[in-house]
């Protein structure tokens, strides 16, 4: 949901309730996502404080957040699957999007094969992340294989679209309006009807400085990843400025080097004249 409106794929079988094919060029396909949050959005402060993003595991944290945002249904529910050396498989009991987690492995590449003919490859699997198995129709068989013939124990989950919609609508209710974007600046405004946490889908990395209503503002890291700050009710203007870390030091060193070079050349010219 985080500001990713379009995705590229190498096949024409990625459409589903959350993704629509909008363009094609050769073997490259452009899809538009249905639920896309803007660059910034508000979250109730109580939700932000209660969400245990670090202690519930990849799936548990997402289910907890959806619940805090108002859903009375699990966002992701485990389904029956089977794993053996070189292959994991399951049969989709419902038409839905499916995801999978797995135990630590040294395998780097996995290949998904769906009985409908759709395929998908996963790389750098040893880094550990949630596998997006895509949209499957009820009755389709899904296999995830590896050429190393290693046991990769998958746990497969079904996405509940109603829970997703509830969470999305809660976050999209108070969204920012971006008025200016450049390589070093993002400006906009937000109408806050309920005080809470403004969260930007921008990584909280060195180099960013936040201004709210013209004043430099200390930001916080939300979810261990994103820039955020607390806002009161009312209309606020914001600006995020970016300056590459070490830029000033580098500029001083460069200037000093230029001055040293100039002084050296001037000295050489004087010696030649003498």
Which role fits each region the language model picked out?
Residues 1-86, 106-119, 126-150:
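Conserved luminal/periplasmic juxtamembrane motif of membrane-embedded glycan-processing enzymes
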Residues 71-274:
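Active-site-proximal, structured, solvent-exposed surfaces of multi-pass membrane proteins
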């Amino acid at each position: 949901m985080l500001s990713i409106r379009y995705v590229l794929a190498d096949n024409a079988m990625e459409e589903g309730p959350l993704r629509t094919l909008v363009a094609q060029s050769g073997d490259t396909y452009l899809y538009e996502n249905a639920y896309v949050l803007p660059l910034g959005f508000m979250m109730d402060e109580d939700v932000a404080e209660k969400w245990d993003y670090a202690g519930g595991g990849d799936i548990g944290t997402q289910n907890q957040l959806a619940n805090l945002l108002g859903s009375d249904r699990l966002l992701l529910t485990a389904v029956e699957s089977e794993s053996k050396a070189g292959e994991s498989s399951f049969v989709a009991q419902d038409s839905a999007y499916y995801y999978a987690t797995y135990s630590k492995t040294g395998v780097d590449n996995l290949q998904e094969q769906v009985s409908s003919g759709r395929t998908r490859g996963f790389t750098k699997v040893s880094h550990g992340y949630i596998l997006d198995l895509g949209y499957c129709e009820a009755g389709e068989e899904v296999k995830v294989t590896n050429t190393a013939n290693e046991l990769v124990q998958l746990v497969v989950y079904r996405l509940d679209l109603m829970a997703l919609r509830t969470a999305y609508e809660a976050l999209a209710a108070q969204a920012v309006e971006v008025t200016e974007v450049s390589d070093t600046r993002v400006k906009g405004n937000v109408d806050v009807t309920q005080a809470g946490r403004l969260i930007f889908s921008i990584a909280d990395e060195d180099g960013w400085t936040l201004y709210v209503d013209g004043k430099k503002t200390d930001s916080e890291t939300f979810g261990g990843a994103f820039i955020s700050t607390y806002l009161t009710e009312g209309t606020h203007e914001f600006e995020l400025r970016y300056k590459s870390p070490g830029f000033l030091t580098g500029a001083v060193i460069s200037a000093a080097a230029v001055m040293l070079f100039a002084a050296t050349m001037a000295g050489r010219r004087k010696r030649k004249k003498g």
